A protein has these predicted regions:
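Conserved beta-strand-loop-beta-strand element in the redox core of flavoprotein oxidoreductases
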Residues: 1, 107-131
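FAD-site-proximal beta/loop scaffold in flavoenzymes
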Residues: 17-43, 120-188
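Mid-to-C-terminal Rossmann-like scaffold of FAD/NAD(P)H-dependent oxidoreductases
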Residues: 89-92, 102-104, 109, 200, ...
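N-terminal glycine-rich dinucleotide-binding loop that anchors FAD/FMN and/or NAD(P) in oxidoreductases
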Residues: 16-31, 37, 79-108, 113-114, ...
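Rossmann-like NAD(P)H-binding beta-loop-alpha module
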Residues: 36-66
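Rossmann-like dinucleotide-binding cores of NAD(P)H-dependent redox enzymes
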Residues: 58-103, 215-227
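A conserved FAD-binding loop/helix module that cradles the flavin
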Residues: 57, 181-212
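Glycine/serine-rich phosphate-binding loop and adjoining beta1-alpha1 elements at the start
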Residues: 1-30, 257, 261-262
Length: 262
């Protein structure tokens, strides 16, 4: 079972009935250039979260015509899960980031945030509040797997969050013959990790069907540059990739980073 994590995480934010609150996954899907109904966001858009999805949502909002897109994140940049280049590109496109801030409530055209401070590596409330003008709010607090269909199966157990499935080293759940991997098990959520889970599970499934145990072979030796015996070593500068000008980038969904060749 490898169904991914496609459900947006929910958070309870006190809001007026007229407040416009969206989840980032649905927003990005609706914002697709082939979609007939583009989201109506207003002039000022707030994005709650600090991951790559939050960066994508903020940059997409700018491309849909928002005058201002601001990210609200409860920790500092050092602890932000988004890739460094994603944050750099978002900032260069005019996205504002409010660090150490958490949303307390939302009204029709404004958001109240509480400032945080880092104490012993943790973000804690300060009791200091700030009001930010915003016409809409996009929640980008991560995704989770829809694992409800597994909860009636005896033997399958879940982590504390109730959405990730516990597996043994062979990628098998507590029910014999049911294996799981990817975003629905405790791990880093990357394509590389999910691909590795698939390969590992396939080998163990094959062994289980044969009523045997898969034994992992020894790792191949690591070949360093010294062992390659390359007769030359260049000190040439790294070739820079061309970037689309910021003024044009925020008006299009085209690639903004070109390849190494033209």
């Amino acid at each position: 079972v490898a169904i991914g994590a496609h459900l947006a995480k929910k958070v309870n934010i006190p809001a007026q009935e007229a407040s416009k609150i969206l989840d980032a996954v649905s927003f990005l899907k609706d914002a697709d250039e082939n979609s007939e109904d583009k989201p109506l966001l207003g002039r000022r858009v707030a994005i709650y979260g600090g991951g790559n999805t939050a960066m994508d949502a903020a940059r997409t909002a700018k491309r849909l015509g928002a005058d201002e897109a601001m990210i609200i994140y409860r920790r500092d940049r050092e602890h932000m899960p988004a890739h460094e280049f994603e944050a750099d590109e978002a900032l260069s496109e005019g996205v504002k980031i409010h660090w150490l801030s958490t949303i307390k409530n939302m009204e029709t055209s404004s958001i109240t945030v509480e400032k945080m401070q880092v104490v012993d590596g943790k973000a804690v409330p300060t009791g200091e509040y700030e009001t930010l003008e915003a016409d809409s709010l996009i929640l980008a607090l991560g995704q989770e797997a829809d694992t409800d269909f597994l909860k009636h199966i005896e033997g399958i157990t879940f982590k504390e969050d109730g959405t990730t499935v516990e597996v043994n080293p062979a990628m098998m759940t507590g029910y014999p013959g049911i294996f799981a991997g990817g975003d629905m098990v405790p791990s880093e959520r990357t394509v590389t990790i999910a691909t590795g889970h698939g390969k590992k599970a396939a080998r163990n499934i094959d062994a289980w069907l044969r009523n045997s145990i898969y034994e992992k072979p020894a790792n191949n030796p690591l070949v360093t540059i010294e062992k390659l015996q390359i007769w030359f070593k260049t000190n040439a500068e790294k070739k820079a990739q061309q970037h689309l000008e910021i003024e044009k980038a925020v008006e299009t969904f085209d690639e903004i980073v070109a390849g190494y060749t033209t």
